[in-house]
Curated annotation (Swiss-Prot):
SMART domains: AAA. The keyword ATP-binding applies. Belongs to the ABC transporter superfamily. Residues 18-246 form the ABC transporter domain. This is Fluoroquinolones export ATP-binding protein Rv2688c. One of its GO terms (biological process) is response to antibiotic. Part of the ABC transporter complex Rv2686c/Rv2687c/Rv2688c involved in fluoroquinolones export. Confers resistance to ciprofloxacin and, to a lesser extent, norfloxacin, moxifloxacin and sparfloxacin. Probably responsible for energy coupling to the transport system. Its EC number is 7.6.2.-. GO terms for molecular function: ATP binding; ATP hydrolysis activity; efflux transmembrane transporter activity; transmembrane transporter activity. It comes from Mycobacterium tuberculosis (strain ATCC 25618 / H37Rv). Inhibited by reserpine and verapamil. It comes from the Bacteria.
Length: 301
């Protein structure tokens, strides 16, 4: 563990929102457990990502933490209590956005949010402001049954924010969205973190996880096989090489690679910098996708 990671871990002590220890769960009549001995913590104000292919156990873990599934082994506490030990006040403090839309199709987007707001005892957000934030203001009074798939994906995200939750559970929050609307959702998530909210995110989209998450856990067959910040995971498995793209003597684009160790004293590297027009210089980092495949031997499908 690096000095930075130790500092982060130390700062997380006393501010844990989620603690999972030895968590196991088997669905009735299933041959194998869906979750096998998971262990992790999530600190206040952290964006934590659970990453893995379909069927890895991500959504099951999330449902256990939300309280939708019971009878698990091990420990899964939120604010120092198992979800089953909480009363209705637990759901006043959390927000949930599932991957599959579940709205009232014969109500408008605005009416859906108004209805869900009525279920909370505390103050709630303005539905129109939430719809505007996710790009649905112009369709606020359109029946949800007439919404496109992308619109139906954005509505549950808006709904999850209606009670201004301290802890947000997001399942594939940008799945099925075009780049513009995916950017809106990501920006909201970043803003929520800046406001001290805690976000538990499950996805198989490595680019989204890399961009948003403070730490990620790779999950395969119900087990966590790696857990760290995206940057640390990539650095640990990156090639220590630098690629330079430059204009050759004839004006064509040429490429050269140099080892990072001893780069400051590499005469060939300095020759390229002195004698050619350099277009790009990049270190050869592994992508989070590359790391996942190397660690797990699996593709994200």
């Amino acid at each position: 563990m690096t000095a930075l990671n130790r500092a982060v871990a130390s700062a997380r002590v006393g501010t844990e929102v989620i603690r999972v220890r030895g968590l196991t769960f088997r669905y009735p009549k299933a041959a194998e457990p869906a979750v096998r001995g998971m262990e992790f913590t999530v600190g206040r104000g952290e964006i934590f990502g659970l990453l893995g292919p379909s069927g890895a156990g991500k959504s099951t873990t999330q449902k256990l933490l939300i309280g939708l599934l019971r009878d698990h082994g091990g420990q899964a506490t939120v604010w120092d209590k198992e979800p089953a030990e909480w009363g209705p006040d637990y759901y006043e403090r959390i927000g949930v956005s599932f991957e599959l839309p579940n709205h009232y199709q014969k109500l408008t987007g605005y009416e859906n949010l108004r209805f869900f707001a009525s279920l909370y005892a505390g103050a709630t957000a303005d539905p129109m402001q939430l719809l505007a934030a996710v790009g649905l203001a112009d369709d606020a009074h359109t029946l949800v049954g007439k919404y496109s798939k992308g619109m139906q994906m954005r509505l549950p995200f808006a709904r999850s924010l209606i009670n201004d939750p301290e802890l947000l559970f997001l399942d594939e929050p940008t799945s099925g969205l075009d780049p513009v609307n995916a950017r809106k959702i990501k920006d909201i998530i970043v803003d929520l973190k800046a406001r001290g909210r805690t976000i538990f995110l499950t996805t198989h989209d490595m680019a989204t996880a890399d961009e948003l998450c403070d730490r990620v856990a790779f999950v395969v067959d119900g087990r966590i096989v790696a857990l760290d910040s995206p940057t640390e995971l990539k650095i640990a498995r990156s090639r220590r090489r630098v690629r330079v793209e430059y204009r050759g003597d004839g004006g064509g684009l040429e490429t050269a690679e140099f080892g990072m160790d001893g780069l400051a004293d590499d005469p060939a590297f300095h020759s390229v910098l002195r004698n050619h027009h350099v277009e790009t210089i990049h270190s050869r980092e592994a992508s989070l996708d590359d790391v996942f495949v190397e660690v797990t031997g699996r593709q994200l499908t």
